[in-house]
């Protein structure tokens, strides 16, 4: 496959006609003087990196609860890895690397403590008030909750970064406004009333690069963490077509290599294989459709940045393997049950008595209607790190589940 790529990924070629041009950005909700030294998308990336929400990702879980070890991935390390892959794919496709990086870095801002376990628990608790969705929460953080600037709430990111954050996995509605996968979260609908995010159209090419980079990163690095935890073995991976084929090649080339380095070599080669497959497949898609502008990508009616059919099938098989042997492993499930209980307990306490929350969060909630109170509690809870949630539970309860 590398021969098909030539120097495609080296960044020597000019920006494509279908790329998102920062000079033509649709701007920000609140007008600002543009920087003389950075493009709008570079400013977005920098604002994301300097935000409090970005730093909190350091202590938020991917698969393994952060308490379990210092070398497992967190939302922060995952986001950095996604950003690196997104830049590589965007560079090869001649898109705007900075926009792809910005979307990648911000895409996990709305995740709760304890990964998807925490999100499921909070979504259940919020069922009567519209539920909880981490993409909608990411939007709330960067448009309302992050308090850094004198003239506006949030980060005042460009339209293109917000569009990518909300729609990196595809359109949310049909042309009539009906949700494609159920009701669209109210936070997204409300913001789109102020700055139309065109929820019925696809995102630009750069957001699509970030989305597939997310898939590549977690499909590969969850294997790495699973091997480190002893829940997966190299012999188990032999039964899965993509890592199995790569592992065979590594062992043939390095027959005396120890298992740790063999695992790292497997991860490195798997990322390379998936990235190169995406570049070739996306290039073919773009040549077939022939978009001549960023808006033409949005109106194309399909995702352009995709795996080949063969790689998509291999990725589906790998996801099924990880779900069965890692995400549903009895040890992971035991810890998740405790984490779920922590989130549920905290929500119940804060909702029943907002005075249990810090001053900045509880103000005015004693007289607020339940809908507003519940959303404020969800905002506070979703912003917690794993470590802070554990600390709060120990402060408020006599007994806290053991997550070790």
UniProtKB/Swiss-Prot annotation:
Record-given protein name: Deoxyguanosinetriphosphate triphosphohydrolase-like protein 1
Pfam families per the UniProt record, alphabetical: HD, HD_assoc
Keyword Transcription regulation: no
Keyword terms of this UniProt record: Hydrolase
Gene Ontology molecular function terms on file: dGTPase activity
Family that this chain belongs to: Belongs to the dGTPase family. Type 2 subfamily.
HAMAP family: dGTPase_type2 (MF_01212)
GO biological process: dGTP catabolic process
Boundaries of every HD domain copy: 75-219
């Amino acid at each position: 496959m590398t021969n098909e790529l030539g120097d495609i990924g080296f960044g020597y070629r000019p920006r494509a006609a279908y790329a998102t041009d920062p000079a033509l950005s649709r701007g920000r909700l609140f007008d600002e003087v543009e920087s003389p030294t950075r493009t709008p998308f570079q400013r977005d990336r920098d604002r994301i990196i300097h935000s409090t929400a970005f730093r909190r990702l350091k202590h938020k879980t991917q698969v393994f609860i952060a308490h379990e070890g210092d070398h497992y991935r967190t939302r922060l390390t995952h986001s950095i890895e996604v950003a690196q892959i997104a830049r590589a794919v965007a560079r090869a496709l001649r898109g705007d690397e900075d926009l792809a990086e910005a979307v990648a870095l911000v895409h996990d801002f709305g995740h709760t403590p304890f990964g998807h376990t925490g999100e499921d628990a909070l979504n259940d608790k919020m069922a009567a008030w519209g539920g909880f969705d981490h993409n909608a929460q990411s939007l709330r953080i960067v448009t309302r909750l992050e308090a850094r600037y004198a003239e506006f709430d949030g980060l005042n990111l460009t339209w293109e970064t917000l569009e990518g954050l909300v729609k990196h996995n595809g359109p949310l509605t049909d042309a009539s406004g009906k949700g494609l996968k159920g009701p669209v979260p109210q936070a997204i609908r409300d913001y789109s009333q102020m700055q139309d995010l065109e929820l019925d159209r696809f995102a630009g090419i750069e957001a699509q690069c970030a989305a597939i980079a997310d898939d590549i990163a977690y499909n590969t690095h969850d294997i790495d963490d699973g091997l480190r935890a002893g829940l997966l073995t190299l012999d188990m991976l032999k039964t899965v077509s993509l890592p199995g084929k790569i592992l065979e090649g590594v062992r043939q080339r390095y027959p005396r290599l120890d298992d740790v380095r063999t695992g790292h070599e497997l991860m490195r080669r798997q990322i390379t294989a998936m990235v190169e497959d995406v570049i070739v497949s996306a290039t073919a898609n773009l040549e077939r459709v022939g978009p001549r502008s960023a808006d033409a990508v949005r109106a194309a009616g399909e995702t352009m940045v995709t795996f080949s059919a063969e790689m998509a099938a291999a990725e589906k098989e790998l996801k099924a393997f990880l779900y069965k042997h890692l995400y549903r492993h009895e040890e992971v499930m035991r810890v998740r049950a405790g984490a779920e209980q922590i989130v549920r307990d905290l929500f119940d306490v804060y909702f029943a008595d907002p005075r249990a929350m810090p001053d900045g969060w509880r103000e005015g909630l004693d007289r607020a209607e339940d809908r507003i109170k519940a959303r404020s509690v969800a905002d506070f809870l979703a912003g917690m790190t794993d470590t802070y949630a554990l600390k709060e539970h120990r402060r408020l309860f006599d007994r806290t589940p053991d997550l070790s």
